[in-house]
Amino acid sequence: MTLATSSANGAWEAVIGLETHVQLGTNSKIFTCASTTFGDDPNTHIDPVVCGLPGTLPVLNQMVLEYAVKAAMALNLNIAEHSKFDRKQYFYPDLPKNYQISQFDEPIAEEGWIEVEVAEKGKDTYLKRIGIERLHMEEDAGKLVHAGSDRLAGSTHSLVDYNRAGVALAEIVSKPDLRTGREAAEYASEIRRIMRYLGVSDGNMQEGSLRCDVNISVRQGADAPFGTKVEIKNMNSFSAIQKACEYEIQRQIKVYEAGEAVVQETRLWDEGKQLTKSMRSKEGSSDYRYFPDPDLGPIEVMASVREGWRDELPELPAAKRHRYAEEFGLSVYDARVLTDEYPMAEYFEAAVAAGAEAKGVANWIQGDLAAYVNANRISYSTLPFRPEQLAEMVQLIDGGKISGKIAKEILPELLEKGGSPEAIVDQRGLGMISDPAAITTIVEELLAVHPQEVEAFRGGKTKLQSFFVGQLMKKTGGKADPKLANQILSKKLKG
């Protein structure tokens, strides 16, 4: 839970803000042409600029600027007419230059918002607008590997891989508008969804393409001043974000109710133990001694360029969800699932455009197709079973040519190889039996070999009709028209 009640002073309220670091999916780093490929041998994607060697000068990757501006536009941020880069000074082994190029007082974008749908356990889903303070560009640091432990404490020694150093980041800073762990997780999920729709990042949390730091405090009542803020790191899933928030809220409440003070610090989420651990005291901005980077000029994006980039933005997830509900009559749940991944949404729309009924398409995509795609770790964009073929199969079912059972039988082959469902049905004689005379003959044969069941049915055990339906389907290989079969069975059983 995320709210606790103090017996003396009433309800506690959590105040949560997120700093989301999004790796921008450019082929080269933010200030140099070094590769950004993930997973290669350590320290194979570094160069003099990354290492800050004497005589080297950074040059801004224009694609980074474009991606950052598009991300800002999608988050309803105001794009700055003038921005600049600054040096953030601190000393740590993963920072080869002993400073990080970031943006301090003049970021590329400020003052935006997104709306998220929040489904709290035991409550109705609600829509919440979350303010976004800023988006700024910066370079990523390297990665430390601690031998013998997953953190510095307890390790025998540490290794550093600078392949990640210099990779472009867009840091998105929310306002402290979140109140529960669930809201924080939904906000982070929507940020990733938007970035993926834009194509500016793959948002893969396991590879560090999207990382979230949570700032959290508690206060007694919505009108009380903010409490002491604690930063939480090391959460590599949306579930971890929610659980870390929920744990930290309760920890801080217990500290206050014991008459003690919450320490301003950075803590790590321990997934194994399901708790947060103290890491270090929290620095303030003055500790970093920011100053403008003398090697990089100011950034000014012409209005015509900005509008050109705005015209390239796709329909975003929230707008697509709303349209699916309005245009296709889908439920809020169906619209949310279908728009979760851009390739899935495109697949759905292509199948509907091919003539199939939207709800039928939605059911197949969310069921059997989603299971296959997830199990095989592929995308809908590379699925052999193309959307127009799914549309054909749905139309065969709706038109009464095949049953859902037959569709499920031929689907594994279609998912593996693709092809025309109608052609497979015709070649194998799988078309539905919808001739009343043919079904009547089969029904009469079944009644003749099951006289006891017929007598029991006529004696009041009407549920036995499902037994006869099952026998009929077994005898016809599932090809009998279910509606027609039930009608004929009902008539014959009643005598």
Swiss-Prot record:
Keyword Zinc: no
Source species of the chain: Prochlorococcus marinus (strain MIT 9313)
Gene name of the encoded protein: gatB
Catalytic activity, EC: 6.3.5.-
Protein biosynthesis as UniProt keyword: yes
Reaction catalysed by this enzyme: L-glutamyl-tRNA(Gln) + L-glutamine + ATP + H2O = L-glutaminyl-tRNA(Gln) + L-glutamate + ADP + phosphate + H(+); L-aspartyl-tRNA(Asn) + L-glutamine + ATP + H2O = L-asparaginyl-tRNA(Asn) + L-glutamate + ADP + phosphate + 2 H(+)
Protein name from the UniProt record: Aspartyl/glutamyl-tRNA(Asn/Gln) amidotransferase subunit B
PANTHER family: GLUTAMYL-TRNA GLN AMIDOTRANSFERASE SUBUNIT B MITOCHONDRIAL AND PROKARYOTIC PET112-RELATED, GLUTAMYL-TRNA(GLN) AMIDOTRANSFERASE SUBUNIT B, MITOCHONDRIAL
Any single Pfam family the record assigns to this protein: GatB_N
HAMAP family (UniProt xref): GatB (MF_00121)
Known partners and oligomeric status: Heterotrimer of A, B and C subunits.
One GO biological process term: glutaminyl-tRNAGln biosynthesis via transamidation
Gene3D superfamilies for the chain: 1.10.10.410, GatB domain, N-terminal subdomain (1.10.150.380)
Keywords per UniProt: ATP-binding, Ligase, Nucleotide-binding, Protein biosynthesis
One Gene Ontology molecular-function label: ATP binding
Protein family (similarity comment): Belongs to the GatB/GatE family. GatB subfamily.
Coiled coil: none
Tree of life domain: Bacteria
Biological function: Allows the formation of correctly charged Asn-tRNA(Asn) or Gln-tRNA(Gln) through the transamidation of misacylated Asp-tRNA(Asn) or Glu-tRNA(Gln) in organisms which lack either or both of asparaginyl-tRNA or glutaminyl-tRNA synthetases. The reaction takes place in the presence of glutamine and ATP through an activated phospho-Asp-tRNA(Asn) or phospho-Glu-tRNA(Gln).
